[in-house]
Amino acid sequence: MNAPYQVDKITAAQFSDWQQQAQQIPLSLPTLNPYIPSDFSLIPSDGKHYDHPVALTNGDSMRIYWMPSQFYASEPKAAITLALRNKSAISDARQQVLFGLNDYLSSLALDELNSQASVGGISFSTGEDDGLVFNASGFTQRLPELLKKLVEGYASFQPDAQQLEQAKSWYLDRLEAAEKGKAFEQAIQPMQMLSQLPYTQREARRQLVKQITLQEVMDYRDALIQHATPEMMVVGNLSADRVRQLGEELKQQLHSTGHGYWHSNYVVVDKPIKANLQKTGSSTDSALATLYVPLGYSEYQSMANSTMLSQIVQPWFYNQLRTEEQLGYAVFAYQMPIGRQWGIGFLLQSNSKAPAYLLQRFQAFYPQAEQRLRSMKAEDFAQYQQALINDLKQRPQTLDEEANRYSRDFNRQNFAFDTREKAIAQIQQLTPASLADFFHQAVLAQQGMAMISQIGGSHDGTHDADYAPLPGFTTWDEVARLQQSLSVKSDAP
């Protein structure tokens, strides 16, 4: 091509101008992610077999429990739980609101750290269990430093007024969402809430949100950490010495004043209670939930019986009320504890029948279920029994799942970590007759707590006739008041 063109010389002035502009352009390499691992070495085996985490500390020092992984020792990973136990964390409605706002604000502040950790193969979370709980798991080389950075970030973030308003909006949205769930979710909520000590009504918390100030959130955050009693559990590829060192570093970092051994409280069913709760739902569907917790059974006996019952009775309940009677499309039999006593429950959501009719059908099903339990062949029962035991003995699928097996015991200060073993031992002792006796005492004789939760459909306004009449039952307008009528215990000596 013969297109015309021209070449001009670059003058010294142009060079000088470009050089000056270049000096004003900030150029640098990206900051290195400090949590990307480079060392994947494994801790040497000490030749011991660990059935559960063991104590690394004694006396009034920070309680630390540790064990190497029994299933994933070839993975350079660990799972750490740091619990800052604090009786004042959520002891009233205001503190519960403060915890929720604080947790949301911390998630904003820790977002960059979360992103860095994720790229480095580490995940972490914060939550509440008798205080603030940090969980971190992943590759072990950077894990202790990440946990310390997480604690530091939580203890030092400084939100602004706009972020507080954002947190308040989020919290109110959560409260509203809980009240607009599906009918069966609303029906079972009172059973779930009853063990949350102390439970406070959502309306009470909603009224408090506007009053909360930024300084109050910061003061609460500081007290949450400073007045706590720290405890830690580690499972995986960290040596006992490194875990002790980490515990000492965290103690110095936290400056927590709590000391001595922590013991949580829990509600207790120690007398016959018949409780009813009822309200209009947020949809046109109705729902009914029942829960029966018998007296006279230990925690592990009730756990074994209720778990076994839910496995056996669920298909019977579903087939009768869903398949044959076509009463609804969310149909469940379930086990659930009130405090540390387990019971058996039934739940159904219907788009055509009111709670009063649903309870009639529940009550027609109960004696049929008892009769089927009593007439069950020994070999059929043994199959259910062995399947449940095999499930409890199944190998964990991940290191996190292995660690989670000990979390419930850790959170309730059962440092023998033997809930699973005790449950299996009780399941092995069950017979068709003993299981039927548990069912009879709980559901038919109602020798313990019988709890009914009725949700009326909102299609044309719920009428009193839609709710089941329950002679002998007390109808409670608030779960909080029902909870306050129960006894409270602690395992503290």
Language model features: what each stretch is:
Residues M1-F71, A187-I212, E216-L250, Y266-V268, ...:
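C-terminal regions of mature proteins
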Residues A55-L82, V97, S283-D285:
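Active-site-adjacent "gating/activation" loops or surface patches in catalytic cores
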Residues M67-F71, G120-F124, M218-R221, N276-G281, ...:
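Short beta-strand/turn micro-motifs at beta-sheet edges
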Residues L246-G260:
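Glycine-centered hinge/linker elements that transmit conformational signals in sensory
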Residues M1, S74-Q211, H227-V235, A287-G296, ...:
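M16 family metallopeptidases and their MPP-like homologs
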Residues Y266-K279:
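Short Gly/Thr-rich strand-loop-strand
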